């Protein structure tokens, strides 16, 4: 594997360096910072949507019963 090329622009490098210049070195870190910020934003949006989804179903279960509750149990009807 030939490592004599800049990882940012593809220009030739000296001594097997990853970057051909300090500008490419800074550009590479700028890309990483932008990607990290983007990932954090997506992650927080995802967490918000999940929490809203769970809160919706929690509210729904608190306001309406899935099954009607009988006034008397079967035990009461049999032994009354």
UniProtKB/Swiss-Prot annotation:
Keywords: Nucleus. Its main location: nucleus. This is Extender of the chronological lifespan protein 1. The gene is ecl1. GO terms for molecular function: zinc ion binding. Induction: Up-regulated transiently when the growth phase was changed from the log phase to the stationary phase. Involved in chronological cell aging. Extends cell viability after entry into the stationary phase probably through affecting the Pka1-dependent pathway negatively. One of its GO terms (biological process) is conjugation with cellular fusion. Belongs to the ecl1 family.
